[in-house]
């Protein structure tokens, strides 16, 4: 039988989950207890960790929190590692089943966004089309881990959550914003209120099925899922984590079951109306490198040219999000959105 002291030694690595992952190491044991035996943990593989209260109830929420799907987006990775540490020490009570995922450990170790292909474009089975990519098996592993985790979760609304944390390549008119996957159903008031609590200023609403991690968990696992963009890409150790305090606090309240947060204003809503798709390496994107996400453009403005392809603004005003001419041909080089705050808030389910 494992003694309390042995269990504590086996769980010491939980003080720095990030360091263990960056080193490519495995913990001394695959399962154990922490937080004075109040929490059970199980290491599920590189960058994957499940934590559950020792007295877990059948109707308890199941929450997946992920970061590092892009390996150079370091601030959310550091926040997630600190979350694990505080749960393991007993400083943060755990009142849910929690799956922690550091998405792309190989890219994290290399200090790169990805090794071969953007991992956040490979979910929903798309990884099968790129079998030679080093990201493909990781996408399949993350899908399997999420599906297994949620397979035993409750089915009531709000019983399943997925928060996928990122940072953006460029600045934004709204420094911290969220993206909600398209499910065919109106977005929920529960999610919008949680995002308001996290002081997220804007929400981008997808209108077609995507291949991101949060799209997969929403579609295949029935989770309330969102992608959070929490600032700009910085190297490990160079982040001012205080800038992310409201979002971090909202995640902590979610996993600890607290309901004492002051209600924030609902975020503004923006709906995708089109995208710029890179046809070839001849793409010209008429958006400067320092133009922030959500910058507005007036009707008629030419934003992109690629051979015979043109994209000009069709609505009175469209805002561009994630402009990136460096993506591979066939991929999205920018999203165009319009504000739909009033209608979106009125339709919240």
Swiss-Prot record:
<feature type="binding site">
    <location>
        <position position="73"/>
    </location>
    <ligand>
        <name>Zn(2+)</name>
    </ligand>
</feature>
<dbReference type="GO" id="GO:0016788">
    <property type="term" value="F:hydrolase activity, acting on ester bonds"/>
</dbReference>
<dbReference type="InterPro" id="IPR007036">
    <property type="entry name" value="Aste_AspA_hybrid_dom"/>
</dbReference>
<keyword id="KW-0479">Metal-binding</keyword>
<dbReference type="GO" id="GO:0008270">
    <property type="term" value="F:zinc ion binding"/>
</dbReference>
<dbReference type="GO" id="GO:0019544">
    <property type="term" value="P:arginine catabolic process to glutamate"/>
</dbReference>
<feature type="binding site">
    <location>
        <position position="70"/>
    </location>
    <ligand>
        <name>Zn(2+)</name>
    </ligand>
</feature>
<dbReference type="InterPro" id="IPR055438">
    <property type="entry name" value="AstE_AspA_cat"/>
</dbReference>
<keyword id="KW-0378">Hydrolase</keyword>
<comment type="similarity">
    <text>Belongs to the AspA/AstE family. Succinylglutamate desuccinylase subfamily.</text>
</comment>
<protein>
    <recommendedName>
        <fullName>Succinylglutamate desuccinylase</fullName>
        <ecNumber>3.5.1.96</ecNumber>
    </recommendedName>
</protein>
<dbReference type="Pfam" id="PF04952">
    <property type="entry name" value="AstE_AspA_hybrid"/>
</dbReference>
<dbReference type="GO" id="GO:0009017">
    <property type="term" value="F:succinylglutamate desuccinylase activity"/>
</dbReference>
<dbReference type="Pfam" id="PF24827">
    <property type="entry name" value="AstE_AspA_cat"/>
</dbReference>
<dbReference type="InterPro" id="IPR050178">
    <property type="entry name" value="AspA/AstE_fam"/>
</dbReference>
<keyword id="KW-0056">Arginine metabolism</keyword>
<comment type="function">
    <text>Transforms N(2)-succinylglutamate into succinate and glutamate.</text>
</comment>
<feature type="active site">
    <location>
        <position position="229"/>
    </location>
</feature>
<dbReference type="GO" id="GO:0019545">
    <property type="term" value="P:arginine catabolic process to succinate"/>
</dbReference>
<feature type="binding site">
    <location>
        <position position="166"/>
    </location>
    <ligand>
        <name>Zn(2+)</name>
    </ligand>
</feature>
<keyword id="KW-0862">Zinc</keyword>
<comment type="pathway">
    <text>Amino-acid degradation; L-arginine degradation via AST pathway; L-glutamate and succinate from L-arginine: step 5/5.</text>
</comment>
<dbReference type="InterPro" id="IPR016681">
    <property type="entry name" value="SuccinylGlu_desuccinylase"/>
</dbReference>
């Amino acid at each position: 039988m494992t003694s309390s002291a042995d269990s504590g030694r086996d769980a010491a690595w939980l003080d720095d989950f990030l360091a263990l992952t960056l080193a490519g190491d495995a913990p001394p044991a695959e399962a154990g207890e922490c937080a004075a035996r109040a929490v059970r943990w199980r290491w599920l593989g590189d960058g994957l960790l499940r934590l559950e209260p020792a007295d877990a109830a059948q109707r308890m929420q199941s929450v997946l929190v992920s970061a590092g799907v892009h390996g150079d987006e370091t601030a959310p990775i550091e926040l997630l590692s600190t979350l694990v540490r505080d749960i393991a020490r007993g400083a943060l009570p755990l009142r849910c089943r929690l799956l922690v995922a550091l998405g792309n450990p190989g890219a994290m170790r290399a200090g790169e966004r990805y090794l071969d292909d953007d991992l956040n474009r490979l979910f929903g089975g798309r990884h099968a089309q790129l079998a030679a990519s080093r990201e493909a098996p990781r996408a399949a592993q993350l899908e399997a881990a999420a599906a297994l985790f949620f397979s035993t979760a409750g089915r009531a609304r709000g019983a399943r959550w997925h928060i996928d944390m990122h940072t953006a390549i460029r600045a934004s008119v709204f420094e911290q914003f969220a993206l909600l996957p398209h499910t065919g159903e109106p977005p929920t008031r529960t999610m919008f209120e949680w995002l308001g609590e996290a002081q997220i200023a804007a929400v981008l609403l997808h209108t077609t099925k995507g291949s991101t991690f949060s799209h997969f968990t929403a579609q295949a696992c029935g989770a309330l899922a969102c992608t959070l963009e929490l600032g700009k890409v910085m190297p490990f150790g160079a982040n001012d984590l205080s800038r992310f305090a409201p979002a971090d606090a909202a995640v902590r309240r979610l996993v600890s079951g607290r309901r004492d947060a002051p209600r924030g204003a609902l975020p503004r809503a923006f709906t995708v109306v089109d995208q710029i798709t890179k046809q070839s390496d001849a793409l010209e994107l008429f958006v400067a490198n320092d133009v922030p996400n959500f910058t507005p453009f007036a009707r008629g403005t030419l934003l992109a040219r690629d051979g015979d392809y043109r994209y000009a603004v069709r609505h009175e005003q469209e805002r561009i999000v994630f402009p990136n001419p460096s993506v591979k041909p066939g991929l999205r080089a920018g999203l165009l959105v319009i504000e739909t705050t009033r209608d979106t808030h009125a339709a919240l389910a």
